Amino acid sequence: MAESAPARHRRKRRSTPLTSSTLPSQATEKSSYFQTTEISLWTVVAAIQAVEKKMESQAARLQSLEGRTGTAEKKLADCEKMAVEFGNQLEGKWAVLGTLLQEYGLLQRRLENVENLLRNRNFWILRLPPGSKGEAPKVSRSLENDGVCFTEQEWENLEDWQKELYRNVMESNYETLVSLKVLGQTEGEAELGTEMLGDLEEEGPGGAHPAGGVMIKQELQYTQEGPADLPGEFSCIAEEQAFLSPEQTELWGGQGSSVLLETGPGDSTLEEPVGSRVPSSSRTVGCPKQKSHRQVQLDQECGQGLKLKKDTSRPYECSECEITFRYKQQLATHLRSHSGWGSCTPEEPEESLRPRPRLKPQTKKAKLHQCDVCLRSFSCKVSLVTHQRCHLQEGPSAGQHVQERFSPNSLVALPGHIPWRKSRSSLICGYCGKSFSHPSDLVRHQRIHTGERPYSCTECEKSFVQKQHLLQHQKIHQRERGGLALEPGRPNGLL
């Protein structure tokens, strides 16, 4: 029964028929199903890939945006710094611009003041330093009082020489006040300076001159009481005397006063009353008895006299003319002029009274010691002995040869005749013209030209030019006598 069951089953299978329509339908269904599933999967994968790409692009854009924001922040910080710097620079520029505007205003004021001064023809005020605020230069009251104000019409009516005189007077007054430091001071100091000037002017012997000429105000006069080597002992600030009238000139020259004429060291101090002067631009002042030994140019005559003060540094005084001297030798030279020995003339210079340096008389020493061989003479016996040794060393023929070759007055001779420090130009060979620093070198050189060999050996009759060569040759003979063999290749002597 068991065996028959599978057989039956086989039979059933064989008995069922297979239709062709059922198989293709199932295959198509399956294939369509698989195709749809594959398509859906690929679309999903593609969508996922597209999303991933979008994400990557968005991430890149986000990173670029972050970088841009960082750079923008940096630029913003730099811009803030630049804005601060520009603000500081603008503040400095504004400050500079403000100072420039102020200076421009001052320059405009000065230009206006200069134009006004040029219109009024006050050219001398242009030399004054301008004010701190650009105002016109301030002139002291004394200078304003000295000046004379002219209108344009009056100035045009003046002649050229009057205009020039006015300019010179105002310039001189200005220079005087500047030198006295009156200008540029406060009003109190300026008034004090003018009061001092007025007091000094009132003390002077000269007052106001009578009318009849152009009056020129005399300024301050100083007397320098310092040492004698100062540039000037007195100075007088005054105008030229050519503007004074003849009457004023006589009155000017007739005042009795004295003038101090200080000189440098070694010169004399002269005194002469002013009353004996001649009113001229230059005059010679000197000793009363000898007309003068020093010419003093008086370019400007001073109205105030200066009293003579004795100088303690000049103790020697002449009893006749009362001139003092610094040195006793100057006084002795001056006294000779009074006695008539060596009267000094006005043409003699002022250095004639100065002490001259004493020079020792250079006496020639007699040459007493003479050489018998070459007839040379010497002042010392030691030099002669040294010279004779040279003759003994050079042999008997050397003295005769030297005597024939050199004249007695020649500079080229043996070492005993010439000092060691002679110039090379004096030691020249007469044969070839070569120069030598020592006479012995010249003698050896000239033996080459003459062929002379004064040093000869007594044993082998060889002769040599120098004594040193002879001594070396004699050592060879000494070795031969001692039985010492000569070294091979060594010469027997120097010929």
UniProtKB/Swiss-Prot annotation:
Residues 1-29, 264-290, 337-361, 476-495 are annotated as: Disordered. Residues 16-25 have a biased composition (Low complexity). Residues 141-219 form the KRAB domain. It comes from Homo sapiens. The gene is ZNF212. Gene3D superfamilies: 6.10.140.140, Classic Zinc Finger. May be involved in transcriptional regulation. GO terms for molecular function: DNA-binding transcription activator activity, RNA polymerase II-specific; DNA-binding transcription factor activity; identical protein binding; RNA polymerase II cis-regulatory region sequence-specific DNA binding; zinc ion binding. This is Zinc finger protein 212. Belongs to the krueppel C2H2-type zinc-finger protein family. It is found in: Nucleus. InterPro entries: KRAB (IPR001909), KRAB_dom_sf (IPR036051), Znf_C2H2_sf (IPR036236), Znf_C2H2_type (IPR013087). It holds the Pfam family KRAB. A zinc finger (C2H2-type) spans 316-338, 369-391, 427-449, 455-477. CDD domains: KRAB_A-box. The keyword Isomerase does not apply. GO terms for cellular component: nucleoplasm. Signal peptide: none annotated. Keywords: DNA-binding, Metal-binding, Nucleus, Repeat, Transcription, Transcription regulation, Zinc, Zinc-finger. One of its GO terms (biological process) is dendrite development.
